[in-house]
Design a protein with these regions (language model features):
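Amphipathic alpha-helical interface surfaces
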Residues: 53, 57, 84, 134-137, ...
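Terminal "cap-and-tail" regions of soluble proteins that handle hydrophobic small molecules
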Residues: 1-29, 116-118, 122-168
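Residue-level detector of solvent-exposed, low-hydrophobicity positions
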Residues: 23, 43, 47, 55, ...
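Generic hydrophobic/packing signal
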Residues: 36, 42, 63, 86, ...
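Hydrophobic ligand-binding cavity/cleft-lining segments
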Residues: 1-64
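Intrinsic-disorder/low-complexity coil detector
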Residues: 20, 42, 74, 78, ...
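Hydrophobic-ligand binding "helix-grip"
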Residues: 58-129
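Hydrophobic pocket/interface hotspot
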Residues: 47-48, 57, 88, 119, ...
Length: 168
């Protein structure tokens, strides 16, 4: 766990993701997956809505357009400043969402135990060389979701600590 200071004078605890071996292999070498866990003292439906409802996504991630499982997200802040294509591959609300983002595979699972909702995010099929660049991006987006759910100021990418060396 690391502490990061935001541009608003806030201190937020940020959980690192893990780089794990991927079962699949690429033609040019090893693949890894990025695995993240977060826990929220909120009902699963509240966390699910924050991560899937267009109106809520617009408050912490960016504007969402499109339909029928093919969406475009225009990020409001972050490492990617262009519109991002998202295709929903599988959705079992409020527990599982599998999407393809610009050709990449992302799995999100949510489980509620008592008053705590656990969120597991897995970004699959990452080349080991790209993990250092991609890892901090998903950590940052999860930190924005966390800040949104906790009614805290959203972290800004420009103020975000560089964490590339933590994703090897």
């Amino acid at each position: 766990m690391t502490t990061s200071g935001g541009g608003h004078g806030m201190t937020m605890m940020s959980m690192l993701g893990e780089v794990r071996p991927e079962h699949d292999r690429a033609a040019d070498g090893e693949l890894v997956l990025l695995h993240y866990l977060r826990s929220f003292r909120k009902p699963v439906l509240e966390v699910w809505s924050a991560a899937t409802d267009r109106g809520q996504l617009a408050r912490w991630l960016g504007a969402v357009s499109g339909g029928s499982g093919n969406l475009t997200i225009e990020p409001m802040d972050g490492p990617v400043s262009r519109p991002v294509a998202v295709r929903v591959g599988h959705c079992q609300a409020p527990h599982e969402l599998i999407v393809h983002i610009d050709g990449c595979l992302l799995e999100i699972r949510m489980t509620q135990v008592g008053v705590v909702t656990n969120v597991e995010l897995v970004r699959r099929h990452v080349s080991a060389a790209d993990a250092r660049e991609i890892g901090p991006r998903w950590q940052y987006l999860l930190d924005r979701l966390t800040a949104y759910l906790d009614y805290q100021p959203l972290p800004q990418w420009a103020d975000y600590p560089k964490r590339e060396d933590e994703y090897r």
